[in-house]
Structures are given as C-alpha cells and as structure tokens.
C-alpha cells in the first residue's frame, strides 16, 4: 500500500473517531450541568433565599410587588371588583324576581302540610312534671310559668283586643290577604278550675295539677272538617288505674271552630291560640305515670309512632306527698 493511501486511511479513521468523541461529550454534558446546578443551589444560604423572597415581595429596581407593577395590580383588582359586583347583582336580581312570586301572607304550597302537632304548658325541663305537694319550691316554678303563659288570655286583654264570635262555626274572613284580620276572644276564665283565677296554684298545691294543651298554628287549617276536635287522656304505659280522673275545660275538652282558620302573624296580629285544660284530679302518688293526650276528629292523625307530637303528646306526671 502506498504511503499516501495509508495517510488517507488514517485521516479517515480519525474522522470517524471524531464524532464518537463528540457524542460522548454530548452525553456527559447534561449530567455535568445537573451536578453544577445542584451545587449552585446547595451553596445558597438562608440569607440568600430571604433576599430573593424580599426582592419578590418588593423589587425597588423594577418597582414591582410580587412580580406586578402598581398599574398591573390596579387593573386586576378593578377586573375582579367589576366581576364580583356583576355576579352579586345577578344573584340579587334573581332573588328579587323569585320573591315577587311569593306571598308574605299565605304559603304557596300547602298540599303536603301535615295535621297539627300539639304542645303542653307548663314546659320547663322536658316532658316530666315532678313535684312534692308538701314542698312549694318544687311546684312554684310550674305555677309561675302558667301565669306567665296565660297573661295574654286575661279577660280584660281579650275584651280590648279581640271580638266575640259565633260558637260552633268557622270564622271565615274575606278581603285582601294584606288586610288585618279580627281574632275571637279566648278568655282564661273559660278554663274554669284551671284558669288560675280561683286557685292561683292551678291545683299544684293540692296534688291535682292542671296541664294546658294547644294545637300548633297552621295557616288556613280548618280542624275537624266542621266538627269540633276533642281531647282525651289515658295511661300510655303502665296500669290504667294510675290515672283515675281527668276533667277537661272548656266544653269537655273541645277546640271550638270559631277560632279557625288562622291567617298568619302578619294579618292575624291579636290571634291567641285556643286551649284545652286537663285537670288531673286523681293520679297515683309517688309513682311515675306516663300519660298520653291526643286529639280526636276528622282529618286528625294521632297514631304515627315516629312523631310523638303529631296529634298527640306523651308526658310523665310524678306527684309526691
């Protein structure tokens, strides 16, 4: 082989090895860069990081706060102010339109309103009424609660605010929904022995307590379908002889129809719910007596076990000597 050819071959070989070396360098460069970057990051102190954070919060050279100039911050705040103002305005407008369709005097949908529940007075610490006849301090709170509750039923108050109505029929009042409705008188004297007039202790001092029962108010509701609803009481759990005698006032424990329907608190301002007083004149002493009092009448539901207040109420009497 001629010397010139050997030199060409050698030069060609060198040319071939050149790219291989360059490729090796290219492969090694990224690793070296990562190592150098890690080294640079590792060399930063907490002071350096704090300085960078300070510059981020306020850069005096570029006069920026968190990367934004005052003009940029002003524009973005103005954008969000306008955006949320429009959003709130749309929500308020939708609420306004919806409220225009609702009457403040009469509920729009009443087809699924259940019959009324009932409640008792006095109601202090739950549905257990316990006291000792010989210790006035045990029954005086119940007496005070009864007087406070019946203050709105005083005869003079009822005569001043309400009118006398025809018994035995619904008191239907026409006119606009916004017109103020009249209310029928319910005087506490109708409760007779349980009025607190003749006996200011409502029988508690004698071991013959009076319990008041009232129906919850439902706008437009007419109980009994033309027949007055009445109340009866019996022992709910235990011996029936534990409850030997109960007197009811007024009208043998009936809710007169003239107090219905109820038109709502906005128009029926002076309305006072009718009451039935239950005078427990003979109850077993020194024993817990579980009593159930319920409403009876057309359309009344009083047998739902999951709701102890729907058309009935269960409470406990404990009368000590």
Curated annotation (Swiss-Prot):
Keywords linked to the UniProt accession: Disulfide bond, Glycoprotein, Hydrogen ion transport, Ion transport, Membrane, Signal-anchor, Transmembrane, Transmembrane helix, Transport
Cytoplasmic topological domain: 1-72
InterPro entries linked: Na/K_ATPase_sub_beta, Na/K_ATPase_sub_beta_sf
GO cellular component: nuclear inner membrane; sodium:potassium-exchanging ATPase complex
Protein origin, superkingdom: Eukaryota
Subcellular location: Membrane
Keyword Ion transport included in the entry's annotation: yes
Quaternary context: Composed of two subunits: alpha (catalytic) and beta (accessory).
Protein name: Protein ATP1B4
Organism, as annotated: Gallus gallus (Chicken)
Gene from which this protein is expressed: ATP1B4
């Amino acid at each position: 082989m001629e010397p010139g050819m050997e030199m060409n071959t050698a030069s060609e070989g060198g040319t071939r090895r050149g790219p291989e070396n360059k490729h090796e360098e290219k492969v090694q460069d990224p690793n070296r860069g990562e190592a150098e970057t890690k080294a640079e990051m590792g060399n930063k102190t907490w002071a350096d990081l704090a300085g960078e954070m300070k510059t981020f919060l306020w850069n005096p050279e570029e006069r920026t706060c968190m990367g934004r100039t005052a003009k940029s911050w002003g524009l973005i705040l103005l954008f969000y102010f306008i955006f949320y103002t429009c959003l709130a305005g749309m929500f308020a407008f939708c609420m306004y339109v919806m409220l225009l369709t609702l009457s403040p005097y009469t509920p729009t949908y009443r087809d699924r309103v259940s019959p009324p529940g009932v409640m008792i007075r006095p109601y202090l610490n739950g549905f257990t009424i316990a006291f000792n006849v010989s210790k006035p301090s045990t029954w005086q709170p119940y007496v005070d609660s009864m007087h406070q509750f019946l203050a709105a039923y005083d005869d003079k108050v009822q005569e001043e605010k309400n009118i006398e109505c025809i018994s035995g029929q619904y008191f239907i009042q026409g006119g606009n929904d916004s017109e103020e409705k009249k209310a029928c008188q319910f005087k506490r004297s109708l409760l007779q022995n349980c009025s607190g007039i003749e006996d200011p202790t409502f029988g508690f001092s004698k071991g013959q307590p009076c319990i008041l029962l009232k129906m919850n108010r439902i706008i437009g509701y007419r109980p009994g379908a033309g027949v007055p609803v009445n109340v009866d009481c019996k022992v709910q759990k235990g011996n029936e002889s534990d409850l030997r005698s109960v007197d009811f006032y007024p009208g043998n424990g009936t809710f007169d129809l003239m107090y219905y329907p109820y038109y709502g608190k906005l128009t029926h301002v002076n309305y006072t719910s009718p009451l039935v007083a239950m005078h427990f004149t003979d109850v077993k002493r020194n024993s817990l007596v579980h009593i159930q009092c319920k409403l009876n009448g057309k359309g009344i539901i009083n047998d739902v076990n999951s709701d102890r207040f729907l058309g009935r109420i269960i409470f406990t009497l404990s009368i000590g000597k």
